[in-house]
Swiss-Prot record:
Family annotation (InterPro entries): Di-copper_centre_dom_sf, Monophenol_mOase_fun, Tyrosinase/Hemocyanin, Tyrosinase_C, Tyrosinase_Cu-bd
Organism taxonomic ancestry: Eukaryota, Fungi, Dikarya, Basidiomycota, Agaricomycotina
Official protein name in the record: Tyrosinase
Primary gene name: tyr1
EC number of this enzyme: 1.14.18.1
Molecular-function GO terms, alphabetical: copper ion binding; tyrosinase activity
Function: This is a copper-containing oxidase that functions in the formation of pigments such as melanins and other polyphenolic compounds.
Organism (species): Pholiota nameko
Subunit note: Monomer.
Keyword check for Oxidoreductase: yes
Catalytic activity: 2 L-dopa + O2 = 2 L-dopaquinone + 2 H2O; L-tyrosine + O2 = L-dopaquinone + H2O
Cofactor: record remark: Binds 2 copper ions per subunit.
Residues the entry annotates as binding Cu cation A: H58, H86, H95
Disulfide topology: none
Amino acid sequence: MSRVVITGVSGTIANRLEINDFVKNDKFFSLYIQALQVMSSVPPQENVRSFFQIGGIHGLPYTPWDGITGDQPFDPNTQWGGYCTHGSVLFPTWHRPYVLLYEQILHKHVQDIAATYTTSDKAAWVQAAANLRQPYWDWAANAVPPDQVIVSKKVTITGSNGHKVEVDNPLYHYKFHPIDSSFPRPYSEWPTTLRQPNSSRPNATDNVAKLRNVLRASQENITSNTYSMLTRVHTWKAFSNHTVGDGGSTSNSLEAIHDGIHVDVGGGGHMGDPAVAAFDPIFFLHHCNVDRLLSLWAAINPGVWVSPGDSEDGTFILPPEAPVDVSTPLTPFSNTETTFWASGGITDTTKLGYTYPEFNGLDLGNAQAVKAAIGNIVNRLYGASVFSGFAAATSAIGAGSVASLAADVPLEKAPAPAPEAAAQPPVPAPAHVEPAVRAVSVHAAAAQPHAEPPVHVSAGGHPSPHGFYDWTARIEFKKYEFGSSFSVLLFLGPVPEDPEQWLVSPNFVGAHHAFVNSAAGHCANCRSQGNVVVEGFVHLTKYISEHAGLRSLNPEVVEPYLTNELHWRVLKADGSVGQLESLEVSVYGTPMNLPVGAMFPVPGNRRHFHGITHGRVGGSRHAIV
């Protein structure tokens, strides 16, 4: 039997577009919806290219996909049953060919559908099909997806005869046909995927209002996490996965941020559990953005790629704690009939048939120019999350001018992409994107240059008069203590008594999440040992500067405030309250400066403030010095 060989879309190199822009393009959206309908209706147990079998690569039903098995028999008592690599240095790169597989199969359906159009502009539909790529959901800029993803059970598209038609929306959920016998409760009783379900009963439904509220409340936390990761994490170990990092930063890993999106979207539903998350159609919008952030981070850190590590809990192929590196096969994704993709072969997305709008118009052969241009865009997109600290610390500016300050950040001089970035071809190969997507959102506008203001830096690594202290809470716990997904929520100010109000409280600052397989009987040894420790960070500075009413961000002002006002709670995915014995919440202050010509704020040595949480349940275990 021949393998499914993953090459990406051949012929052209085209942009993957942000979902808010994508849905505005009638041809793209109409073709995408129809293709997803076809994928979702393919008999799941009979075709490795069906939506169900592609989703099943990630987790359940823990069976071989495309006949790919390991050298040793899979042992459900010692290793994770899906192929996906979580808690591993391979996390970012394993998901790249996974999204590529999905895109490749989807694109074949898109082309077949475009060929059926009988309209006078059929050639335009065929061209749109050639240019269509999997869209991404940039939750760091827009945490609440458009209605076409989370609200509308039906959508209006243009059919093959050119007429508008209302159809069932395959982005809203996936309907199992049938529910797989491997699914545990409550998934075994739900005929469709659910997001933030209103109960665990068989008649549960999506709670769209709660989903929106949770994502909206998490926006600032997600944005600041993303900016900090892109600008302050410079080693692959700290960037790639949610296990305890290299100890040098106060920033979350890509995987940790990704975990939070899963838990926020899913709650007690499918996206909140790695065993069944990939069956929710939003999964690939989410992971396409994870892939985009991998591209942005790699551009800002040229030459840094996969470093050696281990497989943590293992996979369907890899035993637990097996050594992995840049050459480890990314199973089950074949690049030929006899070999698999490895991390070293997927650094250049243009060779895989796609790019992202941020890279349009750039000379990809000039790493330093690309670094400067991408840094420029990252500042525009997400920089306000950190530059509010400068605003709060600079009386001449004031905390109310965060947006204008972010626009005045000094940038390294480099050619910026053109204003219509989403329409420009990447270098070296052209990407032909329809004019309908040219008036594209913040991602294109982010490339605009701006004047450079004067900034003064003091000696000794302390903040200058135009610098500030950046305040961060570090959260550490054992990943498997509960055996299911959960969140540690941080508040500045009183915590509501009703847990239903926690995530929408005005005092909620942010959270760190555990994205945990809850399927009993699989990876039982990992779950029973419960000794995998993960860490995450919640950035406090923006909230303090905008809500605390303090005169500065210096330690003598902020430390007593945090001692009195910082609180935390543990919330399980099913909405129940938890007591996490392994929890340790501690606080760091990091002096930040913005030297003239620097691309990003420059952190000094972080300083522990153990006294803020020491002596409290779940607080710092370190003695106050």
